[in-house]
Amino acid sequence: KYFFVLFLALFESKRKNNLFFYKSKDIKLQIFRSLLSVIESGCFVLSFKYLSLANAHSIGSLAPVIVVALSAIILKEKVSAKTWIAIFIGFVGVLIILRPTSSIFDPKALLPLIAAFVLGLYQIITKKVSEHDANETSLFYTSIIGLIIMSLLASKFWTPIDGYSYAMFLGIG
């Protein structure tokens, strides 16, 4: 994933003749944003191991609600009372799915919720960095940081890919 994003960043910077695409006005924020991308992907994919696909996606779909809440808190954007009510209803829906008072509640069900929160924060920071950095700069940092982290993880957890899996990859696109 991150290798192809890096290719896209390099292609786009060449197309725009942006030779200094790797220069950021806030490199720490770009690196933090990139780490959030890796954390979000990891939490969400890991949630599939422990939850049904439907439950993981239901909980993960809270990300847009989190973005609205964070935009009010971090970006100081105005959010109407109706929107806050919708946010509250969204949280109630997730609580119904999670059933935190149930004796069968599993803390692993928090993985897609963490992923949703991290994705929301990632999107807020993306808006912040877009005020001073080009899109290809953000793509570059996301891809480099992600590629480094995932390469390190792959060296520890890699399992050989069989022919069936290759066929599935080709079928998915």
Q: What positions do the PLM features span?
A:
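Transmembrane alpha-helices of multi-pass small-molecule transport proteins
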Residues: K1-I39, V118-L121, Y141-K156
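Transmembrane alpha-helical segments that form core, pore/gating elements
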Residues: A9, S103-W158, F169-G171
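Loop-to-transmembrane-helix transition segments
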Residues: N18-C43, P107-A115, P160-G173
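Structural motif at transmembrane-helix junctions in multi-pass transporters
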Residues: C43-G60, E131-E136
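C-terminal transmembrane-helix exit sites in multi-pass transporters
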Residues: L46, P64-I85, F157
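Hydrophobic transmembrane alpha-helices of multi-pass small-molecule transport proteins
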Residues: K82-L98
